[in-house]
A protein has these predicted regions:
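Eukaryotic N-terminal targeting leaders
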Residues: 1-17, 25-26, 49-51, 55, ...
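Glycine-rich beta-strand-centered segment in the early N-terminal region that forms part
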Residues: 22-39, 51-95, 101
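Cytochrome P450 core scaffold surrounding the K-helix E-X-X-R motif
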Residues: 42-49
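NAD(P)H dinucleotide-binding glycine-rich loop of Rossmann-like/cofactor-binding domains
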Residues: 91-163, 302
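Mid-domain Rossmann-like dinucleotide-binding core that forms the NAD(H)/NADP(H) cofactor-binding site
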Residues: 131-212
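Glycine-rich cofactor phosphate-binding loops and adjacent beta1-alpha1 units
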Residues: 157, 206-287
Length: 344
């Protein structure tokens, strides 16, 4: 049995401690991945700073995004995954309160339906940027209590509807743009002007400056949706309150699915009759979307070049010891990139 090492979070408010961790063999529906690269997300420094989740016990291991090699396969895992496969995966340690399922260690147990085999021409570094952003975008777009859009495919039928992706250059946004297009929807997005080229390159038909004053942005959005049918709004980053105010006005001017879902904390003063929800990637394990995206769609989409890993990976160091440097940088804010740590 291999030895395992992890970046332990002893308690909130202190740095990681690099220590031994048990190597855990997989349950019947899981695989074990030897991690080559892990990526960092804002939730990582939030959970280092404070116990935001009452169900998460400390000491623990954090981290959600991994790319690596399958080294052990559970007895009921389908033939889709086998020993030696190069994969990306969404780690579930935070949601399950099981350190063996977290990313920030050498070996991670992952539910097989949240594992995607990656093509040989895709590096572990680039693959590692995808899992959490992809999962959050997928839940927001396709979950029945969210926008409830049709699932993506390699040859989508046009729906004649248009999604608004707010903050399209964010980790969730870049995935939402591509998933929306793959599901047959047109995508209008907001972003900083410096990221217009990025979001248009991913397929957005229009990019609008979210830093514009509210009146200007409302008029631009109204013009962008003139004659179009709204499929809903996925708000991926930024202040939800100001975005809700603009979208409430927009909903009065357009036709379609007037529903707003966000990844961030909702304000208390939401207008009456404003349909909304908050999305969490953790629901992907139980709603059928995980298998549809990670198992069925993503492997061929990556292989055929129909889905691009984004945002851009930026290596902050090598080894588990570099994770603390990464979360410290992430606290200061990053734009249109994903901080990653190579473990090999």
């Amino acid at each position: 049995m291999p030895s395992n090492t992890a970046a332990w979070q002893p308690k909130p408010g202190v740095p990681y401690e690099i220590k031994d961790a048990p190597y855990t063999s997989p349950p019947v529906d899981c695989v074990v991945i030897k991690n080559h690269t892990v990526a960092l997300n804002p939730i990582d420094f939030l959970l280092q700073d404070k116990a935001h989740f009452p169900t998460l016990s400390y000491p623990t291991i954090l981290g959600l995004d991994i790319a690596g090699e399958v080294v052990e396969v559970g007895s009921e895992v389908s033939s889709r995954l086998k020993l030696g496969d190069r994969v990306l995966a969404l780690a579930g340690g935070v949601s399950t309160n099981k350190p063996s399922r977290a990313a920030f260690q050498e070996y991670t147990v992952v539910v097989a339906k949240l594992v995607t085999k990656i093509p040989d021409n895709l590096s572990y570094n680039d693959a590692s940027v995808l899992p959490l952003g992809l999962a959050t975008a997928a839940c927001g777009l396709f979950q029945e209590d969210q926008l409830a859009l049709q699932y993506p495919s390699l040859s989508p039928n046009p729906t004649g509807q248009t999604i608004l992706v707010w903050s399209g250059a964010s980790s969730v946004g870049v995935n939402a743009i591509q998933l929306g297009l793959a599901a047959g929807y047109e995508v209008v997005t907001t972003a900083s002007p410096k990221n217009f080229e990025l979001v248009r390159g991913l397929g957005a038909s229009e990019a609008l400056d979210y830093n514009a004053d509210s009146a200007t942005l409302l008029e631009q959005l109204t013009n962008a949706f003139k004659g179009k049918t709204l499929a809903g709004v996925l708000h991926c980053a930024g202040d939800a309150g100001s975005s809700i105010s603009i979208c409430a006005e927009l909903f009065a001017r357009v036709e379609g699915n007037k529903f707003f879902t966000t990844t961030v904390l909702l304000p208390e003063d939401i207008p009456a009759n404003f349909k909304h929800n908050r999305v969490f990637a953790t629901t992907i394990t139980d709603n059928g979307i995980g298998e549809a995206i990670f198992a069925d769609f993503l492997t061929p989409a990556l292989s055929e070049g129909k889905f691009k890993p984004a945002p851009q990976a930026e290596v902050v160091g090598t080894g588990l010891e570099s994770l603390q440097k990464g979360v410290d940088i992430l606290r200061t804010g990053v734009s249109a990139k994903k901080l990653i740590v190579s473990l090999n």
